[in-house]
Amino acid sequence: RRVLFRSAWKVAERAVEEGATITLSNTPMAIRMGEVDALAQKLNCQVVPADATSVEDLENVFKTSMDILGGQIDFVLHSIGMSPNVRKKRTYDDLDYGMLDKTLDISAVSFHKMIQSAKKLNAIADYGSIVALSYVAAQRTFYGYNDMADAKALLESIARSFGYIYGREHSVRVNTISQSPTFTTAGSGVKGMDKLFDFSNRMSPLGNATADECADYCIVMFSDLTRKVTMQNLFHDGGFSSVGMSLRAMATYEKGLDEYMDENGNIIYG
């Protein structure tokens, strides 16, 4: 099987374990830092540099990958997310709109550009699979996730809209996987991410899904075993997305439901 990847370490490793031949892609800056090259050497694959917001770059990724792999691509993974507003610690009611544009372009519109580029080039084989990684904040409010929640909501919408078109014309599946919180570069700037990680792990009946388990699920979505699954957002979070309030959380918060205030005595909502 031939697979094209946009930066997802564990999934790349798992795909190669299953016999896939892949290419990797990341920003030129990330490649210069050496980590992607190290993964490529480990997996015996090539890296194609690209700015995910550039249609020209994305078209080059697909063209080059088809040359390297010797034909159309079977599976594609979109695993990209970044918010300048989160990095600059701007709250949702004080966003910089230029930064918001960048958040949406990098984290969601890049998904549309990627699929559109692939479709115009006929780069993905019939009955192929496209997957993007999302998060429950696209559908539920998580204070601190900020404009990344808007980006993930857009990401999921793109999967539905493009999934219909690509499915009708080429039987290509397009889905998003809403993964448990994981410690990533994109999530590192989210306030309280470590506490959210612990909270969701305790709330979920099965606990958080790990990065390795996410990779396993992605492989299933790439496979022919899910040939009729498309236009879906699939929760892979140990059940967290369906839990209202666990008994443990209820007992804990019953002991400490005082209003949360800042150093000036102002109530902090969230």
Over which residues does each language-model region extend?
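Non-catalytic terminal and boundary segments that flank Rossmann-like NAD(P)-dependent oxidoreductase
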Residues: 1, 41, 98, 247-270
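Canonical Rossmann dinucleotide-binding motif of NAD(H)/NADP(H)-dependent dehydrogenases/reductases
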Residues: 1-23
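Catalytic loop of short-chain dehydrogenase/reductase
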Residues: 5-6, 81-168, 178-184, 207, ...
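Aromatic pocket-lining residues of Rossmann-like dinucleotide-binding sites
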Residues: 15, 166, 221
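Conserved glycine-rich Rossmann-like NAD(P)H-binding loop of the short-chain dehydrogenase/reductase
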Residues: 19-36
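Conserved mid-core segment of classical short-chain dehydrogenase/reductases
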Residues: 37, 41-44, 48, 54-59, ...
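Conserved mid-core alpha-helix of short-chain dehydrogenase/reductase
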Residues: 57-60, 102-117, 213, 220, ...
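C-terminal helical subdomain
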Residues: 109, 172, 176, 194-229, ...
